[in-house]
């Protein structure tokens, strides 16, 4: 299995760190000459930074084929995957031998900042245990969006030091990580400008041409669309960007559906740090806060959905009808979600969108949605509206 290392270490019995400064050179030499030696150890055997020696992939596959053991190895790595040259050292895909897990920054439930009173799994099963209180006020959500779900920051006392972690991460992206992904030196200053532009475009279906135009709105833009595309692709490879795919349901009408992905950072704190914003800035600009909060909800919903063997997409058609998130499971069940900061007017807007989209779905060709839900930032508790059955749930009450 391929896990991010902090989580992988909790499930191992033995470990080897390929990038240990004292043994790194020896480890890489061993990987080239006698790689099976690196696999020796009590199972599960964790191999950290495996991408530095990708030839281990085939050695592990061979071992699994002959031992028929399950859960024998855990491969963990940093955000930087093998480059194209290293990928050529892998001869077999490993289908049927390896399971992949995408590790993201922590959700509010994982960091202990959601009560977990409302289970996404229960909603799909028709169980609506609502009424649970949410621990967070709007000020809390502004802080949590800026702090992000980084494990180190989540364990720190609330304050400037915890908020600083996201800024340090953005610095590392611009100065090092975006160039390390494929050993192509990229401009740190342009990377910062690009991150800032992408932060302004969170939750939109912006094409590369739109991103380039935004980049040139404040200062001369000497980079081509192709260069912008390459930088964006590099950010995806290091798991900074995780765009949300479009949902294409069966509809009764013939309105064309937009199929462009929605732009999101993997964590809202990347957006706030790129823009140089703190919690007070978000509270003073609720429009911007709304986009940042949408990124936070997208992060959490993705993790919650994957725990249920599901995924998250978005909907938008040519008429302008748009749904922020569609959570769908492998069995064909799905739920429609709108994201709002809160307040009666915004909640009503979300309800109107959900009911309109639900009414457009062709129920002869697909099932009706398991639930309609407005996820909010503020709100003391979750509830189901008696007049239409729409669930209103603060993000601080949600769990898988």
Regions picked out by a protein language model, each given a short descriptive name:
Residues 1-13:
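P-loop NTPase Walker A phosphate-binding motif
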Residues 13-44:
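Short glycine-rich substrate-engagement loop in P-loop NTPases that contacts/grips substrate
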Residues 39-56:
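Conserved P-loop NTPase "ATPase switch" module shared by AAA+ and STAND
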Residues 83-204:
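Interdomain motor-coupling "hinge/lid" segment immediately C-terminal to the ATP-binding subdomain
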Residues 158-333:
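Accessory nucleic acid-recognition modules appended to NTPase machines
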Residues 375-400:
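Domain-level recognition of nuclease-like catalytic cores that cleave nucleotide substrates
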